[in-house]
Amino acid sequence: MMRVKVKKPILVAGLGISFLLWLGESLHEQAIAMGEWGVLSLMAVGTGVWWWQKKQPQKPAYKTLSPLTITEVNQAISEGKKILKIVKQEDSNYNLVELETQWKNLPQKLNNQSVSWGIISNSNTDKNSLKQLLEKEKIADNFNYLESEDDENVKQKLDLIVFLINTDLTESQWQMIQKCHQNHQRVLISLNQSEQYNTEEQEIILQEIKQRVKTIIQSDDVIGINSKQKIIKVRQYKEDKSYQEWNETQPPNILALITKLDSILSQEREKLILGKVWREAQKIKQQAKVILNKIRRDRAVPMMEKYQWIAAAAAFANPVSSLDLLATAAINAQMIVDLSSIYQQKFTLSQGQTIAATIGKLMIKLGLVELSTHAISSLLKSNAITYVAGGATQGISAAYLTRVAGLSLVEYFQEQEINPNQNQSLDIEKLSTKIKQVFEQTKRTEILQGFVKQTIPQLS
């Protein structure tokens, strides 16, 4: 068989170690030549690199999920019903017929034995070849094959995914596999034999993939296959050192994958169905939450705007900084109480005051107060028509910061789990992130110009 020379991981590792040994010896000789100050400089640089690496954000540890239980699936169904009920309570005119019908059908789907599968691959040629081979083996008759491509909605419907690759996993592919795992989708990784690698190299890559994914995918779920016919050149040597050479056809080989699919069909169908119903329940829950958030936001924004105009008037009437801050804090506290009521958090006035003080400190710490005041002052001075003497800058700044606080709280509340029977404590870190995001979205000159023009009439 003709062999193609490629860089092997073992060879690369060996060369790397040799290079490091040479580099270490060279640095040692140079360090002696540089003397004490040179060594101290190297130590300083090394310390700086170590400190910089410590400062870099660490990737969050990946959470491995336990297999779904019927109790967890029923809980997901129940949560969907709960949110649909809240939507009807808050807006009885909203049309929920389609979502309610989908929700009512979920318990019946637990008894439905139909499961869906699909192949995800960067190569359409490899994907189609494998699909055709599986169809010939009648394996596909037991599944509903879905052409996923890049359609996320279709991917969500897949109970079993054959992840077809022809080389090592990329980071984006690994992230996609993790996402499938989080969605309780069954994943098989099939390494398709490539002409780029010989058999030995293919096996090395296969073992590396198994090692990388072992936290969420079992070793026997990473399978080497050959989905396409290959022509191999064979050379046979004789005793007189002459040789004969001919081509042999190597047929496709997907037996290991077929065996695994048969095993899943006979032993894991119930798990696949639990995953399917759980995902559908989550989708209904998410869609209902989007509707509920829209209903609540439509009520929250006018209320927030009322308080931003009150804050503007109070700051305009009291341009002294200390009075301005006290008035704005008191107004924000009441706004927080009212917004929390809309989102079923129901903070007391005392809690509202504490949160308002926290938001004020966050804004000062992030530099938002100074930045917004400077930007608004510049806009006012650049336009003689809109410029108003006295406390205009403070009035508009107070309104703007009240709006940022209100929008940040709305965004924060919308991401919280919906539980009307339990008040949730405020996550300051998440709220701080929301404040920064809202400020970034609203600080653009054209947005601030529009806000200034909108606020000026409120001060007259």
Feature map (PLM): residue ranges:
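Canonical P-loop GTPase G-domain recognition
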Residues: 71, 98, 197-273
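Membrane-interface alpha-helices
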Residues: 327-355, 398-415
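Charge-biased C-terminal accessory regions appended to nucleic-acid-, cytoskeletal NTPase
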Residues: 371, 380-460
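Conserved G1/Walker A P-loop phosphate-binding module
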Residues: 2-150, 407
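C-terminal-of-GTPase-core extension/linker across diverse P-loop GTPases
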Residues: 74-120, 243-311
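Transmembrane alpha-helical segments and their cytosolic interface motifs
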Residues: 4-14, 292-331, 357-366
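Conserved Switch II/interswitch segment of TRAFAC-class P-loop GTPases
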Residues: 155-174, 187-202
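A structural-propensity feature for long, helix-poor, extended segments
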Residues: 351, 355-383
